[in-house]
Amino acid sequence: MKTLLLTLVVVTIVCLDLGYTLKCNKLIPIASKTCPAGKNLCYKMFMVATPKVPVKRGCIDVCPKSSLLVKYVCCNTDRCN
């Protein structure tokens, strides 16, 4: 009984994500990646002239300001970009 309980505890610890890790979409290949420590935002960058076609996606620490040519959209939930 103790062995079974210990096994369940170990499996639970291994399966749980003890520290929150953000997952953001990448552009190429279309997949997600786990963000490193300190990068707590997902971002999507696209040209203002073609707002439906993202140019870059990934993890970032601070959302950059958009300009006349480039727009950034940032968010803080898994795969939100």
Curated annotation (Swiss-Prot):
Gene Ontology biological process terms in this record: killing of cells of another organism
GO molecular function: toxin activity
UniProt signal peptide: 1-21
Compartments, as annotated in UniProt: Secreted; Target cell membrane
GO cellular component, one term: other organism cell membrane
InterPro entries xrefs: Cytotoxin_Cobra, Snake_3FTx, Snake_toxin-like_sf, Snake_toxin_con_site, Toxin_cobra-type
Record key words, sorted: Cardiotoxin, Cytolysis, Disulfide bond, Membrane, Secreted, Signal, Target cell membrane, Target membrane, Toxin
Disulfide topology: C24-C42, C35-C59, C63-C74, C75-C80
Coiled coil: none
Origin: domain of life: Eukaryota
Self-association state and partner proteins as the record states: Monomer in solution; Homodimer and oligomer in the presence of negatively charged lipids forming a pore with a size ranging between 20 and 30 Angstroms.
Annotated family: Belongs to the three-finger toxin family. Short-chain subfamily. Type IA cytotoxin sub-subfamily.
Protein name, per record: Cytotoxin 8
